[in-house]
Structure formats: C-alpha cells, structure tokens
Design a protein with these regions (language model features):
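N-terminal cationic and glycine-rich segments that engage phosphates or anionic surfaces
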Residues: 1-126, 133-458
Length: 458
C-alpha cells in the first residue's frame, strides 16, 4: 500500500506543478479557444485511446490469466532485453498477447528498408524525386513490405509464446490456429497504421510517432511502481534513493532535449533580384545543421545488431555480448552507435545538394566560394558537429545499462533513462509542441515558451 501511495504522490506533485504554471494554463485556454486546433487535439486523444484499448484485447484462443502479472511469462519479459524492449514499444500489448501485439515495429522495419533502398536502388531513387506521386508510391511499397514482415513475424511471435507459455493456448497450437492468429496480428498492425494516418491527416502531430510514444509512456506508471516496490524491499534510505533517481531522470531528460535541439547555424546571403517593381533577396538567412541529424536511427540499427548474439545462445560469445549490463555489450553498442551516426548522417545530409540549391536560388555562404568550396565547408562543419553528437548519442544508448548496474534501477524503469525510448519520447513531444505552437502563432496567441518560440525551431 505504501508503494502505491508513493507513486500516487509523485504523479500528484507533477500535476500540481503543471497546474501552477500560469504560462501552461494560459496556453491550454488558447488551445481551447481555437476551434480547429481544439477539434484536432480531441480527435488525436480519441484515436490514441482506441489504440490503448486495443492493447488489452487478447487474441481469441489465448488465456490471458496465464500471461498476467506475476506469471513466469511476465517475469521472462522483464528479464529479456529484446522482448522487454518490444513490450515497451507496444505499450504492454506484446506481453498481453493482444490483437495489437506486434505494434508498429513491422511498419518501422519496412520503412527503414524502403528508405535504405531509396538511397541505393535507382528505381526508388527516381520515386524520391517525383514529388507527391513518388511519395504515394513509396508509401504503397512500405505497406506491401510491412505485410511481408508481418507474415514472418506473426508465426514467430505465436511460436515463441507457445514455447514460453503452452498452457495459455486454449485450443492448442495447430497450423490452423497459427494462421488464424497471424491474420489477426496482421490486421492489428494495419489498423494501427490506419490510426496513425488518420491522426496525421486530421489530428495533431505525426500519428505513428505519437502511437509509439503513447505506448512507451503507458509503461511508465507500471515501471515506476516496480521500482518503488524494489526500493521499499531494501534497507533504509530507499526514499532518498528514489528521489535521487527521479532527479537524475529529470536531468537526463533536460540533457536529451538539449541534444535533440542543438544546431549549428550556417549563414547564407542571398543576392538582390528585381522582378518588376519589387526587390527580392538581399537578406541573410541561416541553414540549421543539427548536431544529432541522425536522431534515433543509429541506436535502432546498433541494437538490432546487438540482438544477433542471442542466436548463438549457450556459447561464451553469446554470454559476453547478450548481457545488457556487461562491459563488452555496452562497449560494442557504443562503438556501433558512433559508427552508425556518421553513416546515417552521411546518407541523409547531402552537402552537394545543399550547395546546388543555394546556387540555384542565388545564395552563398559569406567568405566561401560557391561550388566545391561550399560543399567542402558544409561537409567539414557536419563532421565536426557529428563527433560530439555521436558520443552523446552513445552515452544515451548505454545509460539504461549504467542505471541498472550502478544504481540498481529495475530494467523496466531503466529504459526511461536513455536509448530509443527516451529519444522517441523527447523527439515526438517537441515535434508535436512545435505544431501546436504554429497554430497558436497563426492566431496571434503566445507560443509555448516565454519567448513565444520553442528552442531550436527555425
């Protein structure tokens, strides 16, 4: 009972602090005053609630009591790095054997593959230059590939579930049941994709990103309660340690926001042009080059590779590289994150294209000749700012392991101290706030920050 009280007090304190923030209260009032924005926010919240309800609808033929909290399967999820991470991303639907168990990860996997193909295969490269029609074709290919990924992942999920908890299968694990359950899982993920598209079109923010974030955030109360339980079962000083953990979590969030928002502004001067009686150009603008241009992708790629040793279970190699708190696991993960940060930044940032666009629009960087020198200048800046960004990203990637090893934080709660969970939450919240702010500023209301602009918005 004391543990529940502590968690309740923590959330009440957070709510009280938000309620006493006059700027936030005023912003919420302004959101309500703008009819279009109000409808979009309510629409988004409604569809997110539908998604959360779907996370508790168990696949027919599976006994939910065999998978509940305290079961062997639930304990196995908490202790397994890969499965635990998938359960976090799905908001617990993975562990519930729900119809939405596979979440949006198959779609994310397909999107990454299509994105990489767009950088290497001429057919997809051409589609990227075809504007809106090309984007629609790419989206269609992504949907088809998502179904392909689901056809592989659905039976694998059912097979793993049967291996872990055979008693949960009411009618056994026949071929017919696997096909039936896989069809439901495919329909569940396609439904999530539909929800995401509707939120993007008629709601606020990016639908798929918000669905991922709400799934992660939904696990926070459960993770916090597990951490409080663990602390109160130890010796005295548990309350102090819990407070220190929450303070540390706040500082980590602030540092991550700084990482996501950090940019290097490159000045660009545009030549004056006279069209008719009007003069254009002659002003100085800036190109914002992000320190963490690759965002969360390097951690996703690195963690995907770190799951390979699990295929060689029972060997010394697997033991050394499969422990989330082990030295070699975290050292290798950090090195991979740094390498993938440079790799992915080089793919998505094209100095040659930026230089050509500037030249085409009559722009130039003061003190730098257009053409090859501009390309080299931008490339040099990106190399310099990517170095600290990659190291910071590597630290974020291994923070959950450090929190578990040196602070004794439970794995479920440690996920919120770094890695993909933290970056996704921060990135999605900032992007959504920027979109809300644009509506407010268009209606001549104050933005979400004292300056009227969110830091890093350009």
């Amino acid at each position: 009972m004391n543990q529940y009280l502590v968690v309740g007090v923590v959330f009440l304190v957070v709510i009280a602090l938000l309620a006493t923030n006059k700027k936030l209260v005023e912003t919420l009032k302004n959101i309500y005053k703008i009819e279009e924005l109000r409808k979009r926010v309510i629409y988004t919240i409604g569809l997110l609630l539908v998604y959360r309800l779907g996370s508790f609808v168990v696949i027919p033929g599976i006994n939910p009591n065999a998978l509940g909290e305290g079961s062997a399967y639930a304990s196995q999820l908490e202790g397994n790095g890969l499965l635990g991470l998938l359960n976090v991303f799905s908001g617990g639907a993975f562990g519930n054997a729900a119809i939405l168990a596979l979440g949006v990860m198959p779609y994310i996997t397909a999107s990454i593959i299509i994105q990489l193909m767009g950088m290497m295969i001429p057919y997809f490269q051409k589609m990227q230059t075809e504007g809106e029609s090309g984007r629609r074709k790419m989206n269609q290919w992504t949907r088809f590939l998502t179904i392909g990924v689901l056809i592989l992942q659905g039976p694998a999920y059912i097979a793993n579930l049967y291996h872990q908890v055979p008693t949960a299968f009411v009618y056994g694990n026949s071929f017919g049941f696997v096909a039936y359950a896989t069809t439901i899982l495919i329909a569940g993920t396609m439904f999530i994709m539909w929800l995401g598209e509707k939120i993007t079109d008629k709601g606020i923010g990016n639908g798929i990103s918000l669905i991922i974030m709400i799934g992660i955030v939904a696990r926070l109360p459960h993770a916090l309660l597990a951490e409080v339980n663990a602390r109160f079962q130890t010796a005295s000083g548990s309350a102090i340690m819990l407070i220190l953990e929450l303070v540390l979590l706040f500082l980590v969030f602030m540092a991550t926001i700084a990482l996501v928002q950090a940019v290097r502004k490159v000045p660009v001067q545009y030549a004056k042009r006279i069209v008719g009686n009007k003069q254009y150009g002659g002003v100085r603008q800036y190109i914002p080059l992000k320190m963490n241009a690759a965002n969360v992708m390097p951690i996703i790629f690195a963690q995907a590779l770190m799951f390979i040793p699990a295929l060689f279970s029972g060997t010394a190699f697997a033991a050394a590289f499969s422990s989330m708190t082990g030295f070699w696991y975290n050292f290798t993960l950090a090195v991979l994150v740094i390498a993938f940060t440079y790799f992915y930044t080089a793919i998505i940032i094209n100095p040659q294209m930026m230089a050509d666009d500037m030249k085409r629009n009559g722009g130039f960087i003061p003190g730098v000749k257009p053409g090859k020198q501009t390309v080299n200048y931008i490339d040099t800046i990106m190399t310099r700012i990517t170095l600290p960004g990659s190291f910071f990203l590597a630290i974020v990637a291994i923070l959950p392991a450090l929190a578990m090893k040196f602070l004794g934080i439970q794995q479920a709660f440690a996920y919120f101290y770094g890695g993909t969970s933290l970056l996704i939450m921060v990135g999605v919240v900032l992007d959504t706030l920027k979109q809300i702010e644009s509506y407010l500023l268009m209606r001549h209301y104050d933005g979400l920050m004292k300056t009227g602009r969110i830091q890093g918005r350009h």
